[in-house]
């Protein structure tokens, strides 16, 4: 099973936001089922920015401690989740797909397709209309057999 994880799902788990319990259950299930997990390279960049902001503003980390913590989390993420890169063609498909109201979501979808994923898991299911891949929220995926 190949699963594409949207940025918000990965962040939920790694910075322990509101629904961390569901995110942890999701990651445990995917690990138990030996699922191949994927994210876009854009997700990685976005997460590094947001996690760094969280470390500074919410946890008050600065200097060497902050960067060491950020690097440690980055390594954990990259070891757990494979990164899908875009080529110009897949990015153009994402930009030109009029079914999506958000270009970023459309590019995420194209990354999932490029990785040959079976599912997309996101907290924003409504942002993925009319896709060929099934799109689940973490809680809905946990109920899926």
Language-model segment annotations:
Residues 2, 110-145:
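Acidic, PIN/NYN-like endoribonuclease modules and their adjacent C-terminal/linker elements
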Residues 24-28, 71-75, 109:
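Short amphipathic alpha-helical segments and helix-helix/interface helices
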Residues 1-39, 54-60, 65, 130, ...:
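Short, well-structured N-terminal submotif of metal-dependent ribonuclease cores
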Residues 66-91, 97, 128-145:
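Short acidic, glycine/proline-enriched helix-loop-strand junctions
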């Amino acid at each position: 099973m190949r699963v594409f994880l949207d940025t918000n799902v990965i962040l939920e788990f790694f910075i322990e936001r509101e629904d961390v319990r569901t995110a942890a259950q999701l990651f445990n299930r995917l690990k138990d089922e030996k699922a191949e997990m994927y994210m876009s390279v854009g997700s990685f960049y976005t997460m590094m920015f947001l996690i760094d902001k969280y470390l500074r503003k919410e946890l008050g980390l600065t200097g060497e401690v902050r960067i060491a913590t950020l690097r440690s989390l980055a390594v954990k993420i990259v070891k757990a989740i494979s990164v899908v890169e875009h080529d110009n063609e897949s990015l153009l498909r994402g930009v030109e797909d009029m079914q999506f109201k958000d270009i970023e979501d459309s590019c995420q979808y194209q990354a999932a397709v490029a990785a040959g994923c079976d599912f997309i898991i996101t907290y924003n299911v409504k942002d993925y209309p009319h896709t060929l891949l099934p799109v689940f929220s973490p809680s809905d995926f946990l109920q899926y057999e």
